A protein has these predicted regions:
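Noncatalytic, solvent-exposed loop/strand surfaces
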Residues: 23-233
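Intrinsically disordered/low-complexity terminal segments and short unstructured peptides
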Residues: 6, 12-13, 31, 223
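Bacterial N-terminal signal peptides that target proteins for export
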Residues: 1-12, 21
Length: 233
């Protein structure tokens, strides 16, 4: 288990995933951003219509998550996967609401730990945490962004985590890194990041890198990491 100085000011809950533990055995997988097919639709007919974390209303469990990450959790075969980035030092606090001037010209100076995390869906207990990279950030980010913005994707056997300029990682169900790819850092529009989460299409893993210099889309063999094609976008 990792111990870091900075902790998310939010908790991961089963209600946030739209899953009731009374339905876990029959619950559908939610393997990618916006669910299966990226449709944003659940076939579960017994979802809670309201919940309150403070009052524990329709909350099965709560688990603190280290670091900062805008990525969504994904679910497959009773496991939850998510990503986070943990700073060794203090970072600028996030502000609510809309405002201008949130882009930053320089990367955050502190060392960051880029994590892939796996939790048990029924209990919320950590099964493993894997640090895939420890590095000072290569690119600036907007004040409302994080260094773990892209949602991972899983096929149940492997989980694929994309941290933009900080790499693409394939891990097995035990947290072992099977392969990784590193990419040239580019200037991003207002520090918003790469613009998309990875997807799986058969044996292909497809990612987008939307930037201000040389935007591209690429496909990799999901088992080996071999690049299959790359094109400008």
């Amino acid at each position: 288990m990792f111990s870091f100085n900075y902790t998310r000011g939010m908790l991961l809950t089963t209600a946030a995933l739209g899953l009731s533990l009374g339905q876990v055995a029959a619950a559908e997988n939610w393997p990618t951003f916006r669910g299966d097919g990226a449709r944003g639709i659940s076939e579960n007919k017994n979802l809670p219509l309201e919940w309150d974390a403070k009052q524990n209303k329709n909350i099965e469990w709560k688990t603190a998550v280290p670091g900062l990450g805008w990525s969504n959790p994904v679910v497959h075969s009773g496991r939850i996967y998510l990503t986070s980035a943990v700073s060794d030092g203090e970072i600028e606090p996030r502000k609510p609401g809309l405002y201008f001037g949130g882009d930053r010209k320089e990367p955050i100076k502190h060392m960051h730990h880029f994590l892939v995390l796996c939790l048990d869906l029924k209990s919320g207990e950590y099964l493993w945490q894997k640090e895939v990279l420890a590095s000072r950030p290569l690119t600036p980010i907007h004040i409302k962004n994080s260094y773990a913005a892209e949602t991972p994707v899983t096929d149940g056997e492997r989980v694929y985590a994309y941290f933009g300029s900080h790499g693409l990682y394939c891990l097995d169900k035990t947290g072992k890194v099977l392969w990784k790819k590193m990419f040239k850092p580019y200037e991003m529009r207002n520090g918003w990041g790469t613009g998309a989460s990875p997807i799986l299409d058969g044996d292909q893993l497809i990612i987008v890198n939307d930037n201000m210099e040389d935007s591209w889309m690429a496909s990799f063999d999901k088992r080996t990491g071999r690049q299959l094609w790359k094109t400008k976008r």
